[in-house]
From Swiss-Prot:
Keywords: Cell cycle, Cell division, Chaperone, Cytoplasm, Isomerase, Rotamase. It catalyses: [protein]-peptidylproline (omega=180) = [protein]-peptidylproline (omega=0). GO terms for molecular function: DNA binding; peptidyl-prolyl cis-trans isomerase activity. Involved in protein export. Acts as a chaperone by maintaining the newly synthesized protein in an open conformation. Functions as a peptidyl-prolyl cis-trans isomerase. GO terms for cellular component: cytoplasm. It comes from the Bacteria. The gene is tig. This is Trigger factor. Signal peptide: none annotated. It holds the Pfam family Trigger_N. It is found in: Cytoplasm.
C-alpha cells in the first residue's frame, strides 16, 4: 500500500491510497468468506462458492465488497493523526491488479496563542459582597427566630398565617388537604396569599382556578394568625442562633467565613467562564473553510433531527445569517478546545484516576446515586470518563491562565458603576 498526499489546505489533507496485487488478493479472499455466508447461487453449496464464480455473478458488487475490506487497512495509517472529523472517502476504484482510494481527512488545526495578559476578567469586590452577605444572613436569622404571638385581628403585612388548604374538583370531590404557613409581605401579590390579607382566625377563603380545561376549588381555612416580632440585632440574637456564640461579632465572623467559602467558589467559576468566553480573541487558528462547512452542516442536520431547526432559524433575519453565526460559534469553540489541549500538553497538565473518582463523588448527589455507584459508572463508561476528564482538564488549564489575566474589581450589581472598577493583578 502506498500513501500519497495529494492536497493540503491548512488542516484539511487529501490522501491517495494505492493498493497492490497482494493486498487486493487478501481483500478478495475476505470478501469471498463474507459472501459465502450470505449468498446462495444455484448449483453450488452454501459456503463453497469459488471466488471466480462470485466475481462473475456479482460483478461490481464483488468489487465494492473488496474495496470495503481494503479500506479496513486505512485507519491504522491515520492513528498518529489527531482528527476532528471522521475520514471522508471521495473516490475509490478497483481495476485489475490495482485499487485506488482517495480520502479527505481533517486534522486538529494548529493554533497560535497570543498574550493572555491582554484578557480582562471582572471580580466583584469581596469586602462589599461579604458585608452584604452578612447583613442578609442576619436578616434571615431574625426572620427564622421571630417570636410568634396569636392575634385576634385581621392578618396584615408581617404576620404569619397558618391555613388548611383543601382542593376540590368539579364534582366537589376532595382531592387534597394540607397545612401551609405564609408570611405576608408588603404589597403582597402571590396567588392565594394575597387573598389572606385582612382575614381572621376561622375565616374561609374560596378560590376557583382552571388548569388544562378543568376547574378546581381551593378552600383555605385560617387556623391561626400570628403577630411576628423580630429579635433585635445584638448579642441575644447571636446566642439564640448558636450557644457557641456569646456576641454579635462572633456571629458576624462566622457568617463572614461562611460567605467567604461561597464567594471563593462562585467567583472562581465566574472568572473561569469569563476567561473561556474571551479566549478566542487572542487565538489565531489554521482551519480550512471546508472543515467549518462540514461542521456547520452536521450541526444543522442535528437540529433538524431534533425538530428545533425551524424555531431557531425563525429568530434570525435569514438562514444565511444563522449559518454565519453558527459558523462563528463553532470556530470559537474549536479555538477554546485547542487552547486547552495545547496548553495542557505544554504545561504537562493531566487528570489521574483519583481526580476522576473525586469528581464522580462530588457529582453523585446531582446524579441521584451513591458515591460508590457514581465511581463504578465512571469506570464502566468510557464516554462519561472522557467527559469528566475533559471538564477537570479544562478547569486546571483555566485556573493556570487566571494567574496571567488582568483582574478588574467591580462593585456588586446595584452598588455602582462597574466601569469604575480597579485592576487587581
Amino acid at each position: 500500500m502506498e500513501v500519497k498526499e495529494l492536497e493540503r489546505d491548512k488542516n484539511r489533507v487529501v490522501l491517495e491510497y494505492v493498493f497492490g496485487a497482494e493486498e487486493i488478493a487478501q481483500a478478495e479472499d475476505k470478501a469471498v468468506r463474507y459472501l459465502n455466508q450470505r449468498v446462495e447461487i444455484p448449483g453450488f453449496r452454501k459456503g463453497r462458492i469459488p471466488k471466480n464464480v462470485l466475481k462473475m455473478k456479482l460483478g461490481e458488487e464483488f468489487q465494492e465488497y473488496t474495496l470495503d475490506f481494503l479500506m479496513d487497512l486505512i485507519p491504522d495509517t491515520l492513528k498518529d493523526r489527531k482528527l476532528i472529523l471522521s475520514p471522508i472517502v471521495t473516490e475509490r476504484e478497483l481495476k485489475d491488479v490495482t485499487a485506488r482510494v482517495v480520502v479527505e481527512v481533517h486534522e486538529e488545526p494548529e493554533v497560535r496563542i497570543g498574550d493572555i495578559s491582554k484578557i480582562e476578567v471582572e471580580k466583584v469586590d469581596e469586602e462589599k459582597v461579604l458585608e452584604k452577605y452578612v447583613e442578609r444572613r442576619i436578616e434571615d436569622l431574625r426572620e427564622s427566630h421571630a417570636l410568634l404571638e396569636p392575634k385576634e385581628g385581621p392578618a396584615e403585612a408581617g404576620d404569619l398565617v397558618r391555613v388548611n388548604m383543601e382542593v376540590y374538583n368539579e364534582e366537589e370531590k376532595k382531592l387534597t388537604s394540607r397545612e401551609y404557613e405564609y408570611v405576608i409581605s408588603e404589597d403582597e401579590d402571590r396567588p392565594f396569599v394575597k387573598d389572606l390579607v385582612g382575614k381572621k382566625k376561622g375565616d374561609v377563603v374560596e378560590i376557583e382556578r382552571e388548569y388544562e380545561g378543568k376547574k378546581y376549588t381551593y378552600k383555605l381555612e385560617v387556623e391561626e394568625v400570628y403577630k411576628r416580632t423580630l429579635p433585635e440585632i445584638g448579642d441575644e440574637l447571636a446566642k439564640s442562633v448558636n450557644n457557641e456564640f456569646e456576641t454579635l461579632e462572633q456571629l458576624k465572623e462566622s457568617l463572614k467565613k461562611e460567605g467567604k467559602e461561597i464567594y471563593d467558589v462562585e467567583m472562581k467559576e465566574s472568572m473561569r467562564e469569563q476567561l473561556l468566553e474571551k479566549l478566542p480573541e487572542i487565538v489565531e487558528i489554521e482551519i480550512s473553510d471546508r472543515t467549518l462547512e462540514i461542521l456547520v452542516n452536521e450541526a444543522i442536520n442535528r437540529l433538524k433531527r431534533e425538530g428545533r431547526y425551524e424555531q431557531i432559524v425563525s429568530s434570525y433575519e435569514s438562514e444565511e445569517k444563522f449559518r454565519e453565526e453558527l459558523k462563528e460559534r463553532i470556530l470559537d469553540d474549536i479555538k477554546r478546545d485547542r487552547v486547552i489541549e495545547v496548553l495542557a500538553q505544554e504545561k504537562g497538565i493531566s487528570v489521574n484516576d483519583e481526580e476522576l473518582e473525586k469528581e464522580a463523588e462530588e457529582l453523585a448527589p446531582f446524579w441521584g446515586i451513591s458515591p460508590d455507584r457514581a465511581k463504578s459508572l465512571v469506570k464502566a463508561r468510557q464516554d462519561l470518563r472522557e467527559e469528566l476528564r475533559w471538564a477537570i482538564l479544562k478547569r486546571k488549564v483555566l485556573d493556570l491562565l487566571l494567574q496571567e489575566v488582568k483582574v478588574k474589581v467591580v462593585e456588586p450589581k446595584g452598588e455602582g458603576d462597574d466601569s469604575e472598577g480597579k485592576e487587581d493583578n
